[in-house]
Structure formats: structure tokens, C-alpha cells
Amino acid sequence: MPMLLPHPHQHFLKGLLRAPFRCYHFIFHSSTHLGSGIPCAQPFNSLGLHCTKWMLLSDGLKRKLCVQTTLKDHTEGLSDKEQRFVDKLYTGLIQGQRACLAEAITLVESTHSRKKELAQVLLQKVLLYHREQEQSNKGKPLAFRVGLSGPPGAGKSTFIEYFGKMLTERGHKLSVLAVDPSSCTSGGSLLGDKTRMTELSRDMNAYIRPSPTRGTLGGVTRTTNEAILLCEGAGYDIILIETVGVGQSEFAVADMVDMFVLLLPPAGGDELQGIKRGIIEMADLVAVTKSDGDLIVPARRIQAEYVSALKLLRKRSQVWKPKVIRISARSGEGISEMWDKMKDFQDLMLASGELTAKRRKQQKVWMWNLIQESVLEHFRTHPTVREQIPLLEQKVLIGALSPGLAADFLLKAFKSRD
């Protein structure tokens, strides 16, 4: 029995015990109390509505709290100028305008506090549009997300240019999010990936966006998830994320994509020491690159080695076994076959429901990554912590204080804030 009440009185709630109904479902207006003298378990001021269930049980009235998904208007607090700016970006983006997409990604990459707020408003609008489009597509994903990783010199950019041209010629719209490493000293980045894809960068059905890592580990940027969502909102049906190829720890992209592809050069021994169990376990497809000319024989040997190695690894999917193929971006050998295997992977994962479950899990990982980032930002900007950091750093440098004890002092100062 649904009822909408502003503030139910305590006597009204007690009177429900004498009612013949087994269950009432009430929705209350935003407040820190559910009614007179009935405080919430926590204030839900950020929510537009409260949702509370009162179950009439034999042992009396039992309250169950649950959070409604209806949130307050995300545009609350925006000036007219800011609202027009967000609306302009949103309208242009869903119409597929590349300039608006580029500006939107720049907005979400900004570290300015107000721009970050505007970015969240824009992302919420795009997310709602994205959900509507998926529903009209019978619940199927709008885009196929593919992560590419591999050691330096594996030929990732060369492969993407050949592969991307093939896809656009077949009628697909391709977005490439190329991540470039930032300098540890200056913080700068060359962003040279786009210059290595000259043909693809001129293709009107392809969009290449190089972004700096700015120190983010995992081979991706801080806002890669947001950029993926914006590209899908702009109508791109294949999203390629080329990661920083710097070793076995750089596979955070696997938590953002549908399929993780590992590109390996035809080399062995010390040259592949960084490509070990960790990243191999995450790969859905392994491609041995540069399989042409004098490198065909070593490429075949590496392929056989990894076919054997993959048999020993734990099975990650009930419907898909990782494949190892040889490709050449120079001759085109194996590229079409590789795309066929990628489509097979997508079809099998969709049919089994594993892809849907994987994306839901990725949303949870995305949320916790944002929480960690936000908590760290609040920690660094806390007045007491900011004041104590230089003093404690100096004591750690001269050996008067252990790093662990200094960290404990800062955490206690942060937790004891008013």
C-alpha cells in the first residue's frame, strides 16, 4: 500500500499496528528524520526521496530503510552560464560532434574543483542517455570495449592504425584512447601516439584521443572510465584503449573493458621478463606481432610457447578459452582473423551473461576508485594534515621518525577533525 507523506506523526505509525494490512510502503520527503522522533540511520540530504518500509510483524513494527535511486536534480547550484555550457556539450556530444567530445573529455580530465563538479553533471546526463539507448537496444551494450597492452616496441600503435582502418571501412565508428606516460620530473607528456597513426587520424569515422597518465598506475589515466562513457555517448561502437606499455603491473585496463588483448613481439628470454603470469592471466587474446619476413620463425615459436603456457593458467571464463594468434600490420596477416575471434568472444560472453556481470562488477570498481581518489584529495587538503606534512617529512628525512609512525600521526590528525 504506497503512501506519500511529508512527516508522519508517531501516533499514526503506532496506529498501523491495528490495521489489517500486512505491509505498508511509505515515501518521505527529504529530511534527517522519518517522522516525529524517528531519526534516520543516517541523513540522506543528498537524496531526493526517502524510501522506508514498515513491516507489521508479530513482534511489532519493524522499520527497513532503503535508498531510493531518485536523486536530487544534479544541476542544482549551477549558474545559467554553467548550465548552458553543460547543455551545449551534452547536445553536441550525443549528436556526434567531435569538437564537443574533445571538450567534454578535457572537462573530465580537469583537476579544477568546479570543473570536476560540472564534469559530474555532464556525466550523469550522458549516463542517463546511455541507459536509455541500451534499453532501446534490447539491453545489449552499445559499444565493444577492447583494452590493448604490451611491452614497448610491440607495435601497438602500428597495429591500431591498420586494425582501425579495417574497422572503419566495414562501417564501424572507432574511438582510440591512447595513454602516454607522463614525465616523473616535469609531469609533461609527449602525447605522440596520434602522430604515429597519421592515416587513422584523418579518418572521419575514427577519433583518437591521447591522454597523459599524470602518474596514475595501471597503464591508464585517472579518467579513462569517464572518457569511455563519453565516447559511447557520442556514437562510437568500438572503443580501443591503448595502455602505457611499461611492464607486468600495467593491466588496470582489464577492469574497464570487455576484452583484454595482449600484444607481444616475437622475442624471448630477457626481452619478455616483464610479461609474466600476472598480465598473461588477464589476457583474453594474445597476439604475437611482426609475424613477417625473418621474424616468422621466432613468431611461430613464441606462439607455441604461449599456447602451452595458457593451458596451465586458471580458467577465468566458463565459455571462452584465451587464444594465441600471429599477426602482421605490415602484410595484414592475421588481422581479419583476429577481429573474427574478438567478435566470437563478444557473442559468447553476451549469450552467457558473463559480459553483463563483468560490466556490473567494473561499475563497482570504478566507484571505489573514485572514492579512494576523493578521500586522498580530502586528506591532502585537510588544514591540520597540510600543516603537519612538511614537519613530518623533514623528520622522516633525517631519520628522527619512521615513515609508518609519521603516517599514523597524519591519519590521526585527519580522523580527529571537527
Curated annotation (Swiss-Prot):
One of its GO terms (cellular component) is cytoplasm. This is Methylmalonic aciduria type A protein, mitochondrial. GTP binds at residues 150-158, 292, 328-330. Gene3D superfamilies: 1.10.287.130, 1.20.5.170, P-loop containing nucleotide triphosphate hydrolases (3.40.50.300). GTPase activity is stimulated by MMUT. Homodimer. Interacts with MMUT (the apoenzyme form); the interaction is GTP dependent. NCBIfam families: lao, PRK09435.1. InterPro entries: GTPase_ArgK (IPR005129), P-loop_NTPase (IPR027417). Keywords: Chaperone, Cytoplasm, Disease variant, GTP-binding, Hydrolase, Mitochondrion, Nucleotide-binding, Transit peptide. Changing residue 220 to M: In MACA; decreases protein levels; no effect on binding to GDP; no effect on GTPase activity; abolishes interaction with MUT; impairs GTPase activity stimulation by MUT; highly reduces release of AdoCbl by MMAB. Coiled coil: none annotated. It catalyses: GTP + H2O = GDP + phosphate + H(+). Changing residue 89 to P: In MACA; abolishes protein levels; decreases protein stability. It is found in: Mitochondrion; Cytoplasm. Changing residue 98 to G: In MACA; decreases protein levels; no effect on binding to GDP; decreases by 55% GTPase activity; abolishes interaction with MUT; impairs GTPase activity stimulation by MUT; highly reduces release of AdoCbl by MMAB. It holds the Pfam family MeaB. Belongs to the SIMIBI class G3E GTPase family. ArgK/MeaB subfamily. One of its GO terms (molecular function) is molecular carrier activity. GO terms for biological process: cobalamin metabolic process. Widely expressed. Highest expression is observed in liver and skeletal muscle. Changing residue 258 to N: In MACA; highly decreases protein levels.
